[in-house]
Amino acid sequence: PPHSSNGHSPQDASTSPIKKKKKPGLLNSNNKEQSELRHGPFYYMKQPLTTDPVDVVPQDGRNDFYCWVCHREGQVLCCELCPRVYHAKCLKLTAEPEGDWFCPECEKITVAECIETQSKAMTMLTTEQLSYLLKFALQKMKQPGTEPFQKPVSLDQHPDYAEYIFHPMDLCTLEKNVKKKMYGCTEAFLADAKWILHNCIIYNGGNHKLTQTAKVIIKICEHEVCVPQTKYFLFVIPKLL
């Protein structure tokens, strides 16, 4: 039967994975702030550094419950800038870091957006050109068979989705964010796109057919946005100048 939403298949007791009921806390709008850098939605202002150990459990409904690397629960490190969480062992850390901790995704985004550290390729891009590049990538990501991921999951059809998924994502939402110019670099766009795969694995399991489709979407995204020097800057961007 056709899939009616992104991230999971129609409810079927024979194929639905067994999931523990643990509902992530709702994001408190009073705690939500937009980062000074255009990381995309659901990122927070950097707080003053402390010497206290970093959070090891999601707090205040600001963080996911599932590790960004292995997509499983457990004791996790919470990023100060985004909702992502990680197992220390998945990051191959020998000890828990002290003070405010920023995840690998946010570190890559910060480096890419900082004037002092961004690549020469990114310095050549205007906001409009970046938007054009990301729109082009999105069109490539909308391959035949990706229809389940092209719109938000219907909570009417899948009412338990919010019990597992902290930050829903789909291609339509990505497109809206691009139009609003919420991404300051290709790394930020890719990091947001990865929520599609992360969510799909959490809800459906790693071996589900939809998860394989989600992996293809992310591979296409990585290819389209990670080789700008050889593609966009040689052929696409010069035409926009």
Regions found by a protein language model. Give the residues of each.
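Chromatin reader modules
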Residues: 1-81, 88, 98-241
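C-terminal recognition-helix end and immediately following basic linker
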Residues: 93-95
